[in-house]
Amino acid sequence: MGDSHEDTSATMPEAVAEEVSLFSTTDMVLFSLIVGVLTYWFIFRKKKEEIPEFSKIQTTAPPVKESSFVEKMKKTGRNIIVFYGSQTGTAEEFANRLSKDAHRYGMRGMSADPEEYDLADLSSLPEIDKSLVVFCMATYGEGDPTDNAQDFYDWLQETDVDLTGVKFAVFGLGNKTYEHFNAMGKYVDQRLEQLGAQRIFELGLGDDDGNLEEDFITWREQFWPAVCEFFGVEATGEESSIRQYELVVHEDMDVAKVYTGEMGRLKSYENQKPPFDAKNPFLAAVTANRKLNQGTERHLMHLELDISDSKIRYESGDHVAVYPANDSALVNQIGEILGADLDVIMSLNNLDEESNKKHPFPCPTTYRTALTYYLDITNPPRTNVLYELAQYASEPSEQEHLHKMASSSGEGKELYLSWVVEARRHILAILQDYPSLRPPIDHLCELLPRLQARYYSIASSSKVHPNSVHICAVAVEYEAKSGRVNKGVATSWLRAKEPAGENGGRALVPMFVRKSQFRLPFKSTTPVIMVGPGTGIAPFMGFIQERAWLREQGKEVGETLLYYGCRRSDEDYLYREELARFHKDGALTQLNVAFSREQAHKVYVQHLLKRDREHLWKLIHEGGAHIYVCGDARNMAKDVQNTFYDIVAEFGPMEHTQAVDYVKKLMTKGRYSLDVWS
């Protein structure tokens, strides 16, 4: 934009000079004034752009898109392409499994990131015989596309391309506890058909609140027979184990060329360069880490990350993502049980030279680094991992057990659900429980999924804390059905991060900020109703700080109501002193706290909402209030929403169905916002 402004202001006086003889002296004067005003305006606007007054999240330039995925498919003899919209890696994993399946049917597949290609090329796909495009699309947050599928989503909304002749199928990944279950998968499936593409198999809807793996397997085992029937092909054999990567051990590697945990650019942690994002996180120093609650049953914590000199900007309601590290004790045990030297420098290189994904994680590196920073070793492995590992079990009964759990039989699915998923058995536990299962460590590293960033609602306002990001979290620790004690990867890791001490050592956290739609109203006079039990209070600490700051600036601020819930006042009442101070100062108009275990009958936030229903209705209907809900999606968010249905129905007054529509319209208008998790 800046270049175009400079070009315009430079050429305009010349154009005026050519025509000036056609006008009177008065006209010339007027033109001179106009030119002067325009020139000044352009220069002034240019200066304002160089120093924006609004906060904007820094993002990297979009990746360079390859010229044509269709041409690449032709060149490499592929006829199936599986695009994935993935935020946590699961959709990408499913896409890889589908593309790998293709060889069983005499077809060749490839998985692809839609961010790397121009999807307008879809119209050329019918040029390839028996071609098929599959989309594994996750839904993020409240019905949004994942980051890497945003451009594809925008293109689908705007395009009118004719996709006649394109054959497609869609598998969506979602969670039924969310309002917009599988919105992205449903939209892609519907929109492709509207553009003329032909669906060859029904839309699959995976539910992460249930058993996503089983949903995918059930869809997949019906999908391939449908593909065979449509294209007139037959399966060429049973599912087989085919290595995707080959191991290369580096005997004399320069350590300066070895990855030590970086997510993108080699040595990026030693030489930090903005902008910072998922592929280039900022190493933030921990400046505060304190326990928020009393007692020993749980550990709720408040952390502060220093973002000085990072140029990172955030708004109240945004999310901070952190890249955690696995427990070194677990990593060492895996190395010991497999008899592996974890400090060997190695690379896993893709056997498919045409693939964009050259390595499963940054290489060259060591097994120790891979298992610590790059691979997920604490979540239950998926069935395809068990299938691949089974070949390394020397005891027939153990091999049979693994094969059964990886099968699509009803008995196998039940066994996998109970023994792996519900028992929360991670890879180390499986290796411990199967003494004869000893896979090569390089193949295990190939099979394990990537360790993903963890997202937290930011618990601060940049107006008050421009150089720090605050996190409120609970350390996850529980006894699994297997009898083992499992701990949350990120929260256990964060809990151990001590602020800089006298010795000058700094605890660092790789992080970046992700923009959110969870925003305070544009007008400060708009009332806000905040509902957030437990750590759901996090974004509201930022909201309240910002409303208090606005008051200090002399701005008129509307009513600010908080409905907070915890167990007991003397146990887990988070930010008690801060909230009391905000209430006393008037920044927080109402502080309503529900204690669920302090009396004989349990009191939850929805009970307090019901108590105040008449005032809440006035704020919503007459005051244009915005409602914000943060916390548990499975129970709390639904109960709160049902309470608002009841309030609207009572004071509308209107039928329940009309009340539901009323609240849904509030959501559409951005007046009822959710920041929830399951």
Curated annotation (Swiss-Prot):
Its cofactor is FAD; FMN. FMN binds at residues 86-91, 138-141, 173-182, 208. It catalyses: 2 oxidized [cytochrome P450] + NADPH = 2 reduced [cytochrome P450] + NADP(+) + H(+). InterPro entries: CysJ-like_FAD-binding (IPR003097), FAD-bd_FR_type (IPR017927), Flavdoxin-like (IPR001094), Flavodoxin/NO_synth (IPR008254), Flavoprot_Pyr_Nucl_cyt_Rdtase (IPR001709), Flavoprotein-like_sf (IPR029039), FNR_nucleotide-bd (IPR039261), NADPH_Cyt_P450_Rdtase_alpha (IPR023173). Binds 1 FAD per monomer. Binds 1 FMN per monomer. Residues 44-678 are cytoplasmic. The modification N-acetylglycine is found at G2. The keyword Nucleus does not apply. Keywords: Acetylation, Endoplasmic reticulum, FAD, Flavoprotein, FMN, Membrane, NADP, Oxidoreductase, Transmembrane, Transmembrane helix. It is an enzyme of class 1 (oxidoreductase). One of its GO terms (molecular function) is enzyme binding. Its EC number is 1.6.2.4. FAD binds at R424, R454, Y455, Y456, S457, C472, A473, V474, Y478, G488, V489, A490, T491, W677. Residues 279-521 form the FAD-binding FR-type domain. GO terms for biological process: carnitine metabolic process; cellular response to follicle-stimulating hormone stimulus; cellular response to gonadotropin stimulus; cellular response to peptide hormone stimulus; demethylation; electron transport chain; fatty acid oxidation; flavonoid metabolic process. HAMAP family: NCPR (MF_03212). This enzyme is required for electron transfer from NADP to cytochrome P450 in microsomes. It can also provide electron transfer to heme oxygenase and cytochrome B5. Belongs to the NADPH--cytochrome P450 reductase family. In the N-terminal section; belongs to the flavodoxin family. This is NADPH--cytochrome P450 reductase. It comes from Rattus norvegicus.
